Amino acid sequence: MWGYFFGGNSQQKKDLPKKAIVELREHIQTLNKKKNHLQQQMDDQDQLARKYVSSKQTTLAKSALKRKKGYESNLLKVENQIETLETQLISIEGANLNLETMKAMKQGAKAMKQIHGEYDVDKVEDTMDEIREQVELADEISEAISRPVGNEFVDEDELDEELKELEAEAKEQEQEHRVPAQKAKPQPVSREEELPQFPSVNKKAPVVEEDEDEEALKALQAEMGL
């Protein structure tokens, strides 16, 4: 430890906080074990004193209470030591945490300084100006490419006049379709066309039917041998 204050090894300086924290935790653990042991001895002497009081052994009871008081005094000292070490441990852990935080911040500041050393505000402004110029150039190129070709000399007034003529023509055609067509005059109907049509009767049809019946009768008679 004295080497730390009088320029000892740098590695030992770095490891000293961690080593102190470990040693403090181990010693606090040892004191807690001692505390539990003293508490148990106090309880044993208290029970022994109660036993002697019950058996009317006053002298032995006083001796047990005396030993209990001794253990109680030692227990109080141990508890105070534990409290002191715990306070110191918390302080060292906090200081060590602050140290590690400062190291990280210092390393971060060093990295930022290295990064910013490669450019400054003027360089950033120059870069932004170059970007703006390139964006404007890209817009001009895009506009030139998308501009229509061959329609620069079209007369807009002439187009409007032609459009009006087409609209007037369409309106005129629409009005013509709305005028009802004249009904055709009815043609005179002849007398014959006015009379109802009846199917013509074939007067020779019964003769044909009679001949067929006669032939059928003759065939039947021949078949029967008549």
UniProtKB/Swiss-Prot annotation:
Claim: Transport is one of the keywords in the record: no
InterPro entries on file: Snf7_fam (IPR005024)
Gene Ontology, cellular component aspect: cytoplasmic side of plasma membrane; ESCRT III complex; multivesicular body
Subcellular location: Cytoplasm; Endosome membrane
Pfam family, one: Snf7
Biased composition (Basic and acidic residues): 168-179
Any single biological process term in GO: protein processing
Gene3D superfamilies (UniProt xref): 6.10.250.1710, ESAT-6-like (1.10.287.1060)
Residue ranges, annotated region (Disordered): 168-226
Major localization listed first in the record, in broad terms: cytoplasm
Coiled coil: 18-182
Alphabetic keyword roster: Coiled coil, Cytoplasm, Endosome, Membrane
UniProt topology in membrane: Peripheral membrane protein
Family classification: Belongs to the SNF7 family.
Main function: Required for the sorting and concentration of proteins resulting in the entry of these proteins into the invaginating vesicles of the multivesicular body (MVB). Also required for the proteolytic cleavage of the transcription factor RIM101 in response to alkaline ambient pH.
Summary of subunit composition and partner proteins: A component of the endosomal sorting required for transport complex III (ESCRT-III).
Protein name: Vacuolar-sorting protein SNF7
Gene name as annotated: SNF7
